[in-house]
Amino acid sequence: MTWQFPDRLSTNSALPGPAFSGQPAVDLSSFADFLRRQAPELLPAALGGAQSGPASSSGGTGQLPHGTTIVALKYPGGVVLAGDRRSTQGNMIAGRDVKKVYITDDYTATGIAGTAAIAVEFARLYAVELEHYEKLEGVPLTFAGKVNRLAIMVRGNLAAAMQGLVALPLLAGYDIDAPDPEGAGRIVSFDAAGGWNLEEEGYQSVGSGSIFAKSSMKKLYSQVVDADSAVRVAIEALYDAADDDSATGGPDLVRGIYPTAVTIGAEGALEVPESRIAELAREVIQSRSRADTFGPDAAGGDK
């Protein structure tokens, strides 16, 4: 499944370097393609850069940090993208405050689950890719063009994915060209080969806890009426995922670590304040807690 992709500049064969060595011309509109041909050593190894060390072999992938779980929900007039904060390394917790959701331009954000190093490079390089195109062309990519650009990057990681270095993005955005502003929120999921799917159900999740998160969103999605209710449902979905998936981290009230979330609407992409996420997380935990969670003695009752 693919959109038409007219958002490309003409290639330039007059650039120095590989153009004179018989290689194809450089596509100026793609920063990743330009870098791959002019200075491939600056790219992540999985996307065409220099391979080095044991990380390029399948033998060491089990000890690399991995990140999970990302959820996205559409609401009238926009979309929410949220992620937990835990990364794991084998059966160990590698990090408790990892950022997995990134704003990539004014109207899109990506959340990536999988091998942490590749996932972070995906998000950063994709943001540069969008900015690079806008600077050269003078206008931003259409949402269809953004999807195709990310699909190309994911496909470029296929060789590494076959060795276990998988990183799968979840793209959320607001299509400013949509005829109906209330239904302009978009969620796009990808597979390891670069195939993509535009979600029509209104919610999606990736990562090891995705099956539990999607089940939770399926039950709670009818409660979504605006951005705030969508953020609450996203937090509940991550809480449910953390309850059953050891690689997903739930709200940590002791350390003050909470999921991160981004809302994207007609006003653009905005990070949800941590104070609001903390408030919603406490409400979710309180609503799930038994009356005697801390025992009868905590309330002064008789044994």
Curated annotation (Swiss-Prot):
List the GO cellular component terms.
cytoplasm; proteasome core complex, beta-subunit complex
Q: Protease: is it a keyword of this entry?
A: yes
User: Which BP terms in the Gene Ontology apply to this protein?
Assistant: modification-dependent protein catabolic process; proteasomal protein catabolic process
The activity regulation comment is: The formation of the proteasomal ATPase ARC-20S proteasome complex, likely via the docking of the C-termini of ARC into the intersubunit pockets in the alpha-rings, may trigger opening of the gate for substrate entry. Interconversion between the open-gate and close-gate conformations leads to a dynamic regulation of the 20S proteasome proteolysis activity.
Task: Tell me any Pfam family this protein matches.
Answer: Proteasome
What Gene Ontology molecular function terms does this protein carry? threonine-type endopeptidase activity
Metabolic or biological pathway, per its Swiss-Prot or TrEMBL entry: Protein degradation; proteasomal Pup-dependent pathway
- UniProt keyword list: Autocatalytic cleavage, Cytoplasm, Hydrolase, Protease, Proteasome, Threonine protease, Zymogen
Where does it mainly reside?
Answer: cytoplasm
Top-level lineage group:
Bacteria
Cell compartment(s), UniProt: Cytoplasm
**Gene3D superfamilies this protein is in?**
Glutamine Phosphoribosylpyrophosphate, subunit 1, domain 1
| Active site (record annotation) | 68
Cite the EC number.
3.4.25.1
The reactions it catalyses are: Cleavage of peptide bonds with very broad specificity
Q: Which residues belong to the propeptide?
A: 1-67
Read off the CDD domains from this record.
Answer: proteasome_protease_HslV
Q: Does the keyword Ubl conjugation apply?
A: no
Entry's InterPro entries?
Answer: Ntn_hydrolases_N, Proteasome_sua/b, Proteasome_suB-type, PSB_actinobac
Q: Its quaternary structure?
A: The 20S proteasome core is composed of 14 alpha and 14 beta subunits that assemble into four stacked heptameric rings, resulting in a barrel-shaped structure. The two inner rings, each composed of seven catalytic beta subunits, are sandwiched by two outer rings, each composed of seven alpha subunits. The catalytic chamber with the active sites is on the inside of the barrel. Has a gated structure, the ends of the cylinder being occluded by the N-termini of the alpha-subunits. Is capped by the proteasome-associated ATPase, ARC.
**What is the purpose of this protein?**
Component of the proteasome core, a large protease complex with broad specificity involved in protein degradation.
Report the family membership: Belongs to the peptidase T1B family.
**PANTHER family xrefs:** ATP-DEPENDENT PROTEASE SUBUNIT HSLV, METALLOPROTEASE TLDD
The name this protein carries in UniProt is Proteasome subunit beta
